[in-house]
A protein has these predicted regions:
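Negatively charged, low-complexity tracts enriched in Asp/Glu with abundant Ser/Thr
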Residues: 1-42
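A short, structured beta-strand/loop element
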Residues: 28-68
Length: 98
């Protein structure tokens, strides 16, 4: 399964990343997930903040810091999902921190 990640930026002394995976390929995925996360220095774990994926049969957005919120359905392709989190990562990092 192809995947990649890149640094989105820094917020409140945390470095945020966007990771993306697609199966079977980036240009025609049957399944995909694009995740915003940071690495927690103390716990040495990756903390997922937000994710766009199609794991429930439709493309949706999960704000992982608000587990009780329903999934937000979105009409995005894989590459649009990557662009969405790349452009808006700071909004979700801030919401996660507040």
């Amino acid at each position: 399964m192809p995947n990649f990640e890149f640094k989105a930026g820094e917020y409140r002394e945390k470095v945020y990343f966007v990771s993306a995976r697609a199966d079977p390929a980036f240009d025609s995925p049957d399944e995909f997930a694009v995740t915003l996360y940071y690495n927690d220095v103390e716990s040495e774990e990756s903390i997922q903040v937000a994710r766009i994926d199609n794991s429930h049969g439709y493309v949706h957005f999960d704000r992982l810091y608000r587990r009780d919120e329903p999934k937000e359905e979105m009409d995005l392709t894989f590459w649009e999902a990557v662009e969405f989190l790349e452009e808006n990562w700071r909004t979700y990092a801030k919401s996660h921190e507040d």
